[in-house]
């Protein structure tokens, strides 16, 4: 019976062949196939738009979402592939592509169970994440899973199960050392680009720090976005190893080394949803740290009224979960709670943040003091937890390494090994927002500031973002610049400016303070 079923499947596949054609349509990394409504395959299989179909060519198979089209732009005997589908399938122009129904997804029953408030275990999360990593989930499926886990819907046991499932489907690097240090910031604080300073300081002191970083999810720039302005970050594991062996560290995009492929897929859908829950955050961060071969990890927890973590209580809760899950998967997790009431540095957006980083490394007069001090404190913690400095001696060592140029030399070496230090792009369109009155800056809304920078084009447009001119506690006069919007397109500048004008003031100016 089984042999007959396989034979029937092969016969059906042979009769459901269309010619591969590259459409050039960018579907944001979701594989999509376009087929004529009146093509023989659609008619014989009863395919409709949003159907999940399996495409097979030359022994390679992927699952894609079907879009049914009318009109003559697509030939009747052609399967039009989106850019993502074309790259994933690896088909050649005109190559026969077999189109069949995708296998049923049993793991979706676990997603539905989570939607209705049920708890999931290792087996259920393992099945879901395995299907996610294999590309079997559509963006609709992914959005449902992400939403079902959002907020406080993952308890500690579920967070651990999700973390282990993410580690299981990716590669894991073994550096052959008992001590490999790392850091992560939970985010929510614009301009907090300390990693690009901490890595060269720490590695200049002899510790190994292979830093895999993420791109922005809900922020105007992730560490990988900012580093990419200065040097290539899309390195594979052999290239990453070479950089680390020669310099002691690296700053690369985690998605390019396939350490947690399921997380990279989830992040792609989390970004437009603007969702980033605690359980998913913990699983995302720690799965990548474990996969990257880290043993000791420092977590930066900025706390502020408009940061991602809004209270000391929330920071303690998140920190506790990070340490408990980290301990369960063999990581030593250390915490530092930092001030998250206002942006760090002056620039918000990849190129503007990179400019601030270079200023600190080079010790120029324009270097933001707050970015410098924050990075030194974090580097000091890592130097002490890694044994490169005695307890209480980390700050002195970090300060010396930054001041005498060793950190700048190390950063240049890392950039060179990753592909070369690049010059910074500049935005073509700027608009300065001025203070409406005289007084003191008593509040800065980090969330609105980050949103405005995103609407201006960051991080997609690397030069886009915001330059901040005033800090908390500063006294400003009416008409004095508060911040400047940077955009690479006039439409994006207008869009961001419209947002700023329609919302409550990002900078609160109080006259009687």
From Swiss-Prot:
* Gene Ontology CC: one annotated term: cytosol
The EC number on file is 2.4.2.4
Alphabetized, the UniProt keywords read: Glycosyltransferase, Transferase
What is the catalytic activity of this protein? thymidine + phosphate = 2-deoxy-alpha-D-ribose 1-phosphate + thymine
PROSITE patterns, per database record: THYMID_PHOSPHORYLASE (PS00647)
Annotated InterPro entries:
Glycosyl_Trfase_fam3, Glycosyl_Trfase_fam3_N_dom, Glycosyl_Trfase_fam3_N_dom_sf, Nuc_phospho_transferase, PYNP-like_C_sf, PYNP_C, Pyrmidine_PPase_CS, Thym_Pase_Put
Identify the SMART domains for this entry: PYNP_C (SM00941)
Q: Name one GO biological process term.
A: pyrimidine nucleobase metabolic process
Disulphide bonds annotated for this chain are: none
- Endpoints of the signal sequence: none
Transferase as a keyword of this entry, yes or no, is yes
EC supergroup of this enzyme: transferase
Q: Name one Pfam family in it.
A: Glycos_transf_3
Among the GO molecular function terms of this UniProt record, one is:
1,4-alpha-oligoglucan phosphorylase activity
Keyword Transferase found: yes
> What family is this?
Belongs to the thymidine/pyrimidine-nucleoside phosphorylase family. Type 2 subfamily.
- Protein name stated in the entry: Putative thymidine phosphorylase 2
The record lists the organism as: Acidovorax sp. (strain JS42)
